[in-house]
Amino acid sequence: MEDKGVRIALVVVNLFAAVSAIVGAVGLLVGFMDIPLSELTGTPFADFTVPALLLGIVVGGSALVAAIIALFGPRRFEALASAAAGCIMVGWMAVEIAMVGLDIWVQAAYFVVGLVMIGLAGLLQWAKSHQPGVSGQPHAHRLA
């Protein structure tokens, strides 16, 4: 199986996740997003500063690093970096939904984006492990 298409899809999804998380973080920090502070009732946050920084640095940063690794980094780390970024996105959305509830469809959509990142990373790893070896046969996986 050719992994080029999977790699391209993974880069696109990672870049989308990175850019949208970073833009969302900036929007929260500078007040462009019209989200009332009452949304934070019952959370440990008095304002959106800490959530915005976490969103931009941790969620957006991990997706950006995963995209950069997939584009320019060592191929052996691209699936791992993307899966980690996807897990961070899924975890972020799960915690957000648990803390403030499922208020808008965007929360569910980004949860799915995280799952897509994980799925594409797994597919890329599978494709790489099933490329024909020197003998023309797929690499064998041994349990022992």
Locate predicted features.
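Topology signature of small-to-medium multi-pass alpha-helical membrane proteins
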Residues: M1-A144
